[in-house]
């Protein structure tokens, strides 16, 4: 087949510019609350000239859970940066120009970042955040920006080019800030808490659904990060965070024993 014929059939892949700089995506259960949030964003400089606003309508029941809806946002938004935020936040302090500057600083610090937020943690005891709640008390702790492994869900910002998605085997309205950070890390990206000061009108609820989903997320990732053999069509190796375990399990003699075990197990199950 000639080159001209191929060109007529196939489409050459190119990097297309995004239509918008920011997409602001929200789950809506209360139109008045969402309207106040939207007005505060526009007043802060997120105008429709180069920003799009998307919402998932949950005013008549949960048409979307967070994982399903956010995956829709991440797939459909045509913006360089995708903001996923609660409907009960107000941009009373920092503005669009502040966020532009913070992201430029973050890009200079680490161009391999994929997710940012205003509150997160990078170990069991150290928080990094700046946020004001409905009592107008500003809570600022830790160092910003700071690399984290989990982010609060009130305000998340995702770099579209990272091509992230949330887990397909989790559902509900909690822990997706942790899930997206873990997935970004698995894909080779970093996640950060940055300084972007806003007002969050609620403190969140740690109800039974929170603890149930937290348990599901723990179970999912405990299984995902388990030690195990990986067999390709041309090689095999053992995955483990422990270097010594990897070295032992990759010894040819050990692999031979494991291979014999699986072969015998397969024959036994096939027989019965």
Task: Please identify what each model-predicted range represents.
Residues 86-90:
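The conserved acidic donor/metal-binding loop of glycosyltransferases
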Residues 1-43, 54:
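N-proximal low-complexity "stem/linker" segments adjacent to membrane-targeting elements
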Residues 129-149, 153, 163:
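Short, flexible, basic/aromatic active-site loop/helix in glycosyltransferases
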Residues 61-77:
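Glycine-rich, basic loop-to-helix element that forms the pyrophosphate-binding segment
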Residues 151, 156-163, 170-197:
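A short, conserved alpha-helix in the catalytic core of glycosyltransferases
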Residues 192-221, 232-238:
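Active-site donor/metal-binding and catalytic loop motifs
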Residues 82:
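Short aromatic/hydrophobic "clamp" motif used to bind/position activated sugar donors
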């Amino acid at each position: 087949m000639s080159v001209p014929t191929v060109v007529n059939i196939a489409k050459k892949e190119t990097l297309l510019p995004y239509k918008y700089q920011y997409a602001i995506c929200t789950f809506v259960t209360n139109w008045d609350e969402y309207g106040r949030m939207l007005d505060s964003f526009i007043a802060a400089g997120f105008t429709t000239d180069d920003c799009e606003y998307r919402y998932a309508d949950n005013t008549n029941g949960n048409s979307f859970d967070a994982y399903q809806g956010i995956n829709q946002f991440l797939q459909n938004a045509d913006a360089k940066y995708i903001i996923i935020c609660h409907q009960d936040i107000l941009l009373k302090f920092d503005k669009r120009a502040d966020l532009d500057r913070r992201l430029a600083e973050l890009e200079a610090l680490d161009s391999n970042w994929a997710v940012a937020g205003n509150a997160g943690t990078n170990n069991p005891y150290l928080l990094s955040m700046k946020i004001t709640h409905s009592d107008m008390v500003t809570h600022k702790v830790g160092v910003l920006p700071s690399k984290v492994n989990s982010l609060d869900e009130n305000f998340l910002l995702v770099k579209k080019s990272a091509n992230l998605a949330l887990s397909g085997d989790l559902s509900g309205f909690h822990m997706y800030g942790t899930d997206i950070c873990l997935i970004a890390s698995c894909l080779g990206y970093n996640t950060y808490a940055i300084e972007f000061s806003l007002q969050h009108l609620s403190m969140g609820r740690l109800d039974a659904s929170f603890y149930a989903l937290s348990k599901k997320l723990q179970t999912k990732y405990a299984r995902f990060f388990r030690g195990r053999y990986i067999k390709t069509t041309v090689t095999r190796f053992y995955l483990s965070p422990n270097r010594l375990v990897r070295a032992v399990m990759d010894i040819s003699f050990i692999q031979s024993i494991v291979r014999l075990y699986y072969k015998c197990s397969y024959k036994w199950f096939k027989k019965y």
